[in-house]
């Protein structure tokens, strides 16, 4: 059974501590994945202002965010400037690429994108992407060929903004099938490879205990589905690393074969259906996010 493994790296600590651990685990399992890196300032602690929103507060309490992520992640960029992730930790991004993994852009400023992408102008969206692409390209010494919007905050404006960068594909939304997004002028954009499986922080809480998560998620893989699974370096690369190692072993026993997202693209892109990326909602996730539409 084919499956895509996507690894989002949102923070300085996730890069510094989570990425090396994940590279070790993936090497042991002989699995290649796609890493999407945030490369600018780590301002993730500024999300604490969202605690005044009941849905976000409930998510933080439900997932035990302080224990899961650590206070250094939850406070990053609040009382002091955010650390420059790419400048200080670019060698770990090169290490992921040298190990044979696919590497793409997650964000320049992850917090900034999540908080502002919905109302930034077209020029501001392009500038944020450009800063990230230029930085990651300089780090890797090669063209950046794929991207994934931070927090799945993507709509038709974001898809339009990304067209100028010539990405091979993007993974900006939640959905069920690989597709080509329709643009405002009637043409189609770079393929979208959506995520169709829930993440750890979206479901762990009253209904699913952390110890039961592996069984919960593996039960949702289906031969007829896309099976794109997202983990976070801040979670599965640190506190839940041993659980993730066990998940990969159990997946192999169930004939689930993880691969980089780019390997899920068909040989002939014209065979892909056309759809849209539009704003929607998802249980377990606060605020709007991009979803696949007709």
Curated annotation (Swiss-Prot):
Enzyme class: hydrolase
Pfam families noted in UniProt: Polysacc_deac_1
Keyword Lipid metabolism: yes
GO CC terms in record: membrane
Catalytic activity from the UniProt record: 4-deoxy-4-formamido-alpha-L-arabinopyranosyl di-trans,octa-cis-undecaprenyl phosphate + H2O = 4-amino-4-deoxy-alpha-L-arabinopyranosyl di-trans,octa-cis-undecaprenyl phosphate + formate
Domain of life: Bacteria
GO annotation terms (biological process): 4-amino-4-deoxy-alpha-L-arabinopyranosyl undecaprenyl phosphate biosynthetic process; lipid A biosynthetic process; lipopolysaccharide biosynthetic process; response to antibiotic
Entries under PROSITE patterns matching the protein: NODB
EC number: 3.5.1.n3
Cited NCBIfam families: PRK15394.1
Purpose of the protein: Catalyzes the deformylation of 4-deoxy-4-formamido-L-arabinose-phosphoundecaprenol to 4-amino-4-deoxy-L-arabinose-phosphoundecaprenol. The modified arabinose is attached to lipid A and is required for resistance to polymyxin and cationic antimicrobial peptides.
Protein name stated in the entry: Probable 4-deoxy-4-formamido-L-arabinose-phosphoundecaprenol deformylase ArnD
Organism in which the protein naturally occurs: Pseudomonas fluorescens (strain Pf0-1)
């Amino acid at each position: 059974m084919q499956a895509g493994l996507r690894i989002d790296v949102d923070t300085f600590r996730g890069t510094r501590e989570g990425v090396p651990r994940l590279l070790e685990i993936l090497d042991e399992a002989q699995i290649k994945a796609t890493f999407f890196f945030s490369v600018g300032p780590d301002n993730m602690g500024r999300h604490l202002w969202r605690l005044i929103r009941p849905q976000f507060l409930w998510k933080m309490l439900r997932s035990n965010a302080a224990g899961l992520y650590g206070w250094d992640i939850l406070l990053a960029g609040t009382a002091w400037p955010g650390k420059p992730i790419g400048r200080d930790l670019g060698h770990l991004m090169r290490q992921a690429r040298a190990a044979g993994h696919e590497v793409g852009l997650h964000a320049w400023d992850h917090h900034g994108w999540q908080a502002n992408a919905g109302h930034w102008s077209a020029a501001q969206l392009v500038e944020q992407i450009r800063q990230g692409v230029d930085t990651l390209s300089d780090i890797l010494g090669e063209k950046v060929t794929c991207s994934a919007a931070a927090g799945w905050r993507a709509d038709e404006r974001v898809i339009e903004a990304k067209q100028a960068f010539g990405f091979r594909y993007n993974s900006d939304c939640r959905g069920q099938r690989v597709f080509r997004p329709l643009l405002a002028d009637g043409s189609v954009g770079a393929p979208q490879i959506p995520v169709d499986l829930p993440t750890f922080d979206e479901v762990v809480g009253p209904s699913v205990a952390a110890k039961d998560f592996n069984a919960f998620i593996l039960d949702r893989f289906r031969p007829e589905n896309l099976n794109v699974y997202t983990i976070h370096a801040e979670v599965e690369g640190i506190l839940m690393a041993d659980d993730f190692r066990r998940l990969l072993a159990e997946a192999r026993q169930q004939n689930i074969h993880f691969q980089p997202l780019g390997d899920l693209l068909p040989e002939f892109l014209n065979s892909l259906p056309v759809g849209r990326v539009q704003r929607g909602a998802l249980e377990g996730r606060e605020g709007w996010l991009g979803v696949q539409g007709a």
